[in-house]
A protein has these predicted regions:
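N-terminal secretory signal peptides
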Residues: 1-12
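FAD-dinucleotide binding site
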Residues: 4-6, 18-447
Length: 447
């Protein structure tokens, strides 16, 4: 499973509208071509906007290029013995995340994950207490250094200038590549600081992608509809796919900045200087997973523990191993930045074997365990995303807010790239969809 491509284009038909089955979509032979609001993208931002607008009594149609819903929230329920989130996994700031009450109301199993143990190992030998203390101290010093950056901004890597000890290098790479998905040399300190802490962080046993899927119930969603152009026509917006044109009073665009930057969608009039500047400051980062299913559990670890390389840690090829989430015989390796992109571009089996070798070296062997199944995500190679999520470049300033308001009176941008404190997250994308819906509702009330 090296990559995931969805580029079909079929009519707005009963087949495309009912492709979600369990989501109880309207059994229409053809979707409406004139609505109050058309939503481009059936990820969490688009679904949130559509749900809210429909709840307020507005007619809504969601156009999705893929043959599935959820966007970068995608739970694989078939490849392994347990569900695996191939995209976003954690409910960040779970105590105030808007998806938390939705998940609870539907009976999803949630697990607080902030207290998971961390193991730093080389050939099965655990890091000494002194080494662990150095790692913890480096993380704390980095946080303090980030707090001290002034309004001029700085690249995260600049906080490790000159002679930088291995613990500080680790902290930098954890915060940049393994968190933001961008190179430390290009990642904005002020952008990371504005996002704040993600804690508390919770996992969803059935998959966060399943929670997002549940948002689609009752919505009119046309799958396989790649939008080619969006034209603002005074009192309306025309959204064209290969199959048809939908006319709406308002349009919400939730595609990634990677898609916008690729000009896969033609805008008339074109995007203005503010939007283009924001897109330049918000490239797609890379965060990919290599999923390894073993034929039994690794001994000496509790479900949900983390494993990292100790002295053998490679700053330019950082990996984090999530061990046996919810007691499944799974190891989910995570890589970001250029190394995440490298794994995404490699053949899936090659990526699996490379990561398995790193895990084996870290543990000093697998205790007789064998690889039963594997997969590797490749969000950068998917033309519907071009990456995992948007990180803020150094000096990018208020690019997220600028993109959020760049559309104008009838065109609205939403998605994780436009979020504030929960930027780069599923919860932030959801909130951005609600923001766009509120703006549309206010506009429709005036017409």
């Amino acid at each position: 499973m090296a990559s995931f491509y969805f580029s079909f284009s079929i009519p707005l038909s009963r087949r495309s509208l009912l492709a979600l089955g369990a989501c109880a979509l309207p059994a229409r032979v053809r979707a409406r071509t004139q609505v109050d609001a058309v939503i481009v993208g059936a990820g969490v931002a688009g679904l949130a906007a559509a749900r809210q607008l429909q709840a307020w009594g507005h007619s809504v149609l969601v156009l999705e290029a893929a043959q599935r819903i959820g966007g970068r929230a995608w739970t694989d329920r078939h490849s392994f013995a347990a569900p695996v989130d191939l995209g976003c996994s954690w409910m960040h700031q779970a105590d105030r995340n808007p998806l938390t009450p939705i998940a609870r109301a539907q009976g999803f199993t949630l697990l607080a994950h902030d207290g998971a143990a961390e193991h730093f190992l080389d050939a099965g030998i655990a890091a000494s207490a002194q080494q662990r203390a150095a790692i913890a101290a480096a993380r704390q010093r980095l946080a303090q250094a980030m707090d001290g950056v002034g309004p001029q901004d700085a690249a995260l890597a600049s906080l490790c200038a000159g002679a930088c000890d291995p613990a500080r290098q680790r902290a930098i790479r954890e915060r940049a590549e393994l968190d933001a998905g961008g190179a430390a040399e290009d990642t904005s300190v002020l952008g990371l600081r504005a996002q704040g802490s993600t804690a508390p962080n919770w996992l969803v046993q059935q998959g966060l992608g399943r929670v997002v899927e549940s948002l689609a119930r009752g919505l009119e969603i046309a799958l396989g509809q790649r939008v080619e152009s969006i034209e603002q026509r005074g009192a309306s917006v025309a959204v064209r796919t290969a199959a048809s044109t939908v006319t709406a009073v308002h349009c919400v665009v939730t595609v990634s900045t990677g898609v916008l930057r690729s000009e896969a969608i033609r805008f008339t009039p074109g995007l203005g200087p503010a939007a283009l500047a924001a897109l330049d400051a918000l490239p797609m980062g890379h965060f990919n997973k290599v999923v390894l299913e073993l034929d039994g559990p690794l001994q000496g670890f509790a479900p949900g523990d983390w494993i990292y390389e100790g002295r053998s840690f490679q700053p330019q090829q950082a990996l984090a191993f999530l061990i046996h989430p919810f007691a499944a015989n799974l190891v989910i390796a995570m890589a970001g930045g250029s190394f995440g992109l490298q794994l995404a571009c490699a053949p899936a089996r090659e990526a699996q074997q490379q990561v398995l070798a790193r895990l084996r070296n870290c543990l000093g062997g697998l205790g007789g365990r064998r690889l039963r199944a594997g997969a590797a995500t490749a969000w950068a190679r998917n033309p519907l995303f071009h990456g995992s999520y948007a990180y803020l470049r150094t000096g990018g300033g208020a690019a997220r807010a600028a993109l959020a308001r760049a559309g104008g009176e009838r065109l609205h941008f939403a998605g994780e790239a436009t979020a504030g404190v929960l930027a780069q997250t599923c919860g932030g994308a959801y909130l951005s969809g609600l923001r766009a819906a509120a703006a549309i509702h206010a506009g429709l009330a005036l017409t």
